[in-house]
Regions:
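Positively charged, amphipathic and often flexible ligand-engagement surfaces
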Residues: 1-274
Length: 274
């Protein structure tokens, strides 16, 4: 298996990859790999929701034109979420580089307020390698709201771009600490229908999540790992009775190479502890 087929799949391989995951009793997070804006990107995502209902979908707002046409981006996100609701899908809005993250968070908050109701069909991503991430999560958990919160915890994948902004943790251990504390904060402060997705390959963080799930009798915590990474860990969690997702990036060969290059380059330092 070459590196592209290990970590991504083509349009033609997508259905087979989804079925393969489900045969292993894991679920996909379907992720259209194209990261640059194109007018047809939203249509591509909606088409896949019709083809593969009852699934999770990752959504990168840079691919919908948040840099170029923010108002149009918001309209596209609304249409995608309405399509997701029609097809019983869930939308995980990705975090991206710090320069546009405030806009992404604002749009995500609006979508959760509008569409989540008592069941989160929209998830917000918290990058725990940022110093202010714990405060943002606590604010969202504590604030008065009449909708459920979908929380996706990641460490972060934009190290090169974000490092110069002065927003990152001072060291690796601080990132670990913040991630694990975020799990604890959720365990003690969540509201009834809130859900947590721990997107991590880090064993210690998984132990922390399992500890609080057992201690507080939590049934609203799930796990996710990347396609082609930590497969033994994913299978162990699935066999232990946990809900497990695998990120399933798909696209053309032309689209996959830049994606893989970016993931490798921006995660060289982070990979040892994600």
């Amino acid at each position: 298996m070459n590196v592209i087929n290990r970590f991504t799949c083509s349009h033609g391989q997508l259905e087979k990859s989804i079925l393969r995951l489900k045969s292993r009793r894991m679920s996909p997070i379907i992720d259209y790999i194209k990261e640059s804006y194109h007018v047809n990107n939203a249509m591509e995502i909606k088409e896949k929701m019709y083809l593969y209902p009852n699934n999770h979908f990752a959504l990168k707002l840079s691919a919908l034109g948040i840099r170029e046409k923010e108002e149009q981006c918001v309209a596209q996100v609304e249409k995608i979420i309405e399509c997701a609701l029609e097809n019983e899908c869930t939308v995980l809005i990705d975090a991206e580089e710090h320069a546009i993250q405030e806009h992404i968070d604002g749009i995500t908050d609006h979508m959760m307020e509008t569409y989540n109701g008592m069941n989160p069909c929209v998830y917000k991503t918290y990058q725990m390698y940022k110093k202010d991430a714990p405060e943002k999560l606590r604010y969202d958990l504590f604030k008065a709201r009449n909708y459920s919160l979908g929380v996706k915890l990641v460490r972060g994948a934009y190290l090169k771009k974000d490092k110069s902004m002065g927003v990152l943790c001072t060291d690796e251990e601080m990132t670990h600490t913040q991630y694990n504390q975020a799990i604890a904060d959720f365990a003690y402060q969540y509201k009834k229908k809130d859900k947590l997705l721990c997107a991590t390959h880090n064993i210690r963080s998984i132990h922390v999540a399992r500890h609080y799930m057992k201690l507080n009798k939590l049934y609203n915590v799930e796990f996710a790992q990347l396609m082609g990474m930590s497969d033994a860990l994913s299978e162990y969690l699935q066999r232990s009775g946990y809900k497990v997702y695998k990120y399933l990036p798909y696209g053309s060969l032309y689209e996959s190479v830049p994606y893989l290059t970016r993931r490798l380059y921006e995660n060289m330092y982070m990979l040892k502890y994600i």
